């Protein structure tokens, strides 16, 4: 057996092992759902207070390096750490990073020769999680390591392919993971299936429940005046326990059918806010400018602002390759506090968390 065959066989065994764990977790769903969930709501971030009332929070960002994630026999993702400072009146904000604190997390588990293309970050049950949009694996990020936790299958959960998870949020006692939120099509917009329109509810025990959100995503894009074959792509969705509302920052949208060649220039500056039942929506424009080559990739509510302030990440791609990423701060009414701040490196940052 060749060295490459050995490597592929090892990856297969690893993936099979994780799949078995995920299957076992799923069989425990009824048992765990009967038990009362006890969730650890501890924060993972540090906060520094200044004499003028300003506060500075520690933040973490994670990258999706796409093809560049391959590193020998492993796959990697870059983790960056920094700080967000917000004035006492919430009118000013500043971001800076500590390059010396950057590090990589890696894995041996891949699908189709790709892995560790991490999307979004979420603090859930006192731990920090991310999702690999290639394998469907949820990883716990801890001690500069990526620890496999739960495997998510695509669509309704009865297919072999891993779920292309793009956003993560926490609602009550569940971690909720969503996909692109549009119909899966060919590069020319020909319909294939609805698998990216499902969401996954994950309990603290790792039990998974699959829910079809097709009607939800249709209502979200319809609120912005988009009808099929027009589309809206989602990578940044959060539930607010304070407002009891859903917040969507679409990455791309268009009244035209999907085209891979055109999609890179269909970025948005739209915030869609929905009620808890996801039946009623309002649309907010963020700022007055919209560089359509940049699209939202992730966001979080800034702590101690009653979920009035948002810190968001936009990324820019050209011919399928990352060009740059930008951070901004604005309120839920669309007023910009910190305009798009260029982050260092030609990276596609896809996750941000206060940690």
Curated annotation (Swiss-Prot):
Calcium as UniProt keyword: yes
Subcellular location: Endomembrane system
Induction: By ER stress.
Disruption phenotype: RNAi-mediated knockdown causes a 50% reduction of progeny numbers and a slower growth. RNAi-mediated knockdown at the L4 larval stage results in a reduced lifespan and in the lysosomal accumulation of lipofuscin in the intestine with age. Motility is decreased and muscle sarcomeres are often patched or wrinkled.
Residues bearing glycans: 30, 291
GO terms for biological process, alphabetical: ATF6-mediated unfolded protein response; determination of adult lifespan; endoplasmic reticulum unfolded protein response; gastrulation; GDP catabolic process; IRE1-mediated unfolded protein response; nematode pharynx development; proteoglycan biosynthetic process
Catalysed reactions listed for this entry: a ribonucleoside 5'-diphosphate + H2O = a ribonucleoside 5'-phosphate + phosphate + H(+)
Molecular function GO labels: calcium ion binding; GDP phosphatase activity; UDP phosphatase activity
Cofactor(s) required for function per UniProt: Ca(2+)
Keyword field contains Chaperone: no
Record Pfam families: Apyrase (PF06079)
Residue spans crossing the bilayer: 7-29
Parts of the chain on the Cytoplasmic side: 1-6
GO cellular component terms, semicolon-separated: endomembrane system; membrane
EC number: 3.6.1.6
Protein family membership: Belongs to the apyrase family.
Protein name, UniProt field: Apyrase apy-1
Protein's gene: apy-1
